[in-house]
Curated annotation (Swiss-Prot):
Listed SUPFAM superfamilies: Glutathione synthetase ATP-binding domain-like, Succinyl-CoA synthetase domains
Protein name according to UniProt: Succinate--CoA ligase [ADP-forming] subunit beta
Binding of Mg(2+), residues: N209, D223
Alphabetic keyword roster: ATP-binding, Ligase, Magnesium, Metal-binding, Nucleotide-binding, Tricarboxylic acid cycle
């Protein structure tokens, strides 16, 4: 689950991490009121969307010369003007795609006199099974270009979670940032605080960009992104309440209500599979046969008729879907139960695209009989390769 910048900063502040004063706003009036509570005379007005590149982004509804989603304001009047331009308009960044995201929230913060900018992030390094701490002296809006053009300026420090954060990790961070004296000590302390927050909150990613050194010699978190492991939200009810569903794909939100793991993709073949590994293999073989998957959808090990029906409805809400491939291995789940769900769902949604079903496992023959006697134009498949070839052929024939 992704958090907005102001939400992430609210959480980090609880760990004693230095954060510039700021206030979230849903309206122009709230933005102005928030700015009046800050020392000034400089303010920063930030669009709050779940995407990076806001500073270099452009608003669809504004002219090409308009400012982006992060703006410096030199007065309360400037704050008001920026808030009026940003709220309700669509911000397009390198991470949103051409469709952009509508700005519904702002974050007004106090301006900071910046001496230097750095980059510091933490991610789950799945290859090593450790936490990867990524550090660079080249923080700011161009960090992606730095990673591409001068990767030697980026240092990665791995931390074994079984061992935890050790003093030498903090020293390594400070050394990578080329800090000395009091700033060196601040960096070591900050690295430990961030690691503690990362582990306590079950983060998948925590990015500080930029981490800034102020003119008076303080390290402050100027901007941050935070992503929480959705499977751990039951441990963080306060964090779960921060979820902003308006920033998420509506189909993915609906799928989560039925405990379906759904991710929309750009292809034309809808997929309904049980098990993440089998789902990925199914998508791979669809591509191998010259088509592209329209989604990842894992119905899990306890699919019911209700869940299968919901899955079909979610898949068919995507106008790009031209056919559906169902690939089920019945272990805990019985194939006859799945077949009954498929028949009920196909009739309820008035399926009008080709449907290929491959069943294997417990009660597979009963499942195949149910499909064969359903009176629906369901195409059976014997194995994964056969299923992929058939759905691609059916879609081409129906085109």
């Amino acid at each position: 689950m992704n958090l907005h910048e102001y939400q992430a900063k609210e959480l980090l502040a609880k760990y004693g991490i230095g954060i510039p004063a700021g206030h979230a706003a849903l309206t122009v009036e709230e933005a102005v009121a928030g700015a009046k509570q800050l020392p000034g005379p400089l303010y920063v007005v930030k669009a709050q969307i779940h995407a990076g590149g806001r500073g270099k982004g452009k608003f669809k509804e504004l002219g090409p010369d308009a400012k982006g989603g992060v703006r410096l304001a030199k007065s309360i009047e400037d704050v008001e003007a920026s808030a009026r331009e940003m709220l309700g308009n669509t911000l397009v960044t390198v991470q949103t795609g051409e469709e952009g995201k509508q700005v519904n929230r702002l974050y007004v913060t106090d301006g900071v006199d910046i001496a230097s900018e750095y980059y510091l992030s933490m991610v789950v390094d799945r290859a090593s099974g450790r936490v990867g701490m990524i550090v660079s002296t080249e923080g700011g809006m161009d960090i992606e270009e730095v990673a591409h053009s001068t990767p030697e300026k980026i240092t990665t420090i791995t931390i074994d979670p079984a061992q935890g954060f050790m003093p030498h990790h903090g020293r390594a961070v400070a050394f990578a940032l080329k800090l000395s004296g009091d700033l060196n000590k601040q960096a070591q302390k900050l690295a430990k605080q961030l690691y503690t927050a990362f582990m306590d909150l079950d983060c998948e990613m925590l990015e500080i960009n930029p981490l800034v050194e102020t003119e008076d010699g303080q390290l402050l978190v100027l901007d941050t992104k935070m992503s929480i492991d959705g499977n751990a939200l039951y441990r963080h009810k306060d964090v779960e309440e921060m979820r902003d569903e308006t920033e998420e794909d509506p189909a993915e939100v609906e799928a989560s209500e039925y405990d379906l793991a759904y991710i929309k993709l750009d292809g034309n073949i809808g997929c309904m599979v049980n098990g993440a590994g089998l789902a990925m293999a199914t998508m791979d073989i669809i591509k191998l046969n010259g088509a592209f998957p329209a989604n990842f959808l894992d119905v899990g090990g306890g699919a019911t008729t209700e869940k299968v029906t919901a899955a079909f409805k979610i898949i068919l809400k995507d106008p790009a879907v031209e056919g559906i491939l169902v690939n089920i291995f019945g272990g805990i789940m019985r194939c006859d139960t799945i077949a009954e769900g498929i028949v009920v769902a196909a009739k309820e949604v008035e399926l009008d695209v080709p449907l290929v079903v491959r069943l294997e496992g417990t009660n597979v023959e009963k499942g195949k009989d149910i499909l064969a006697n359903s009176g629906l134009p369901i195409v059976p498949a014997d194995d994964l390769g056969d299923a992929a070839r058939k759905i691609v052929a059916e879609v081409k024939q129906a085109a």
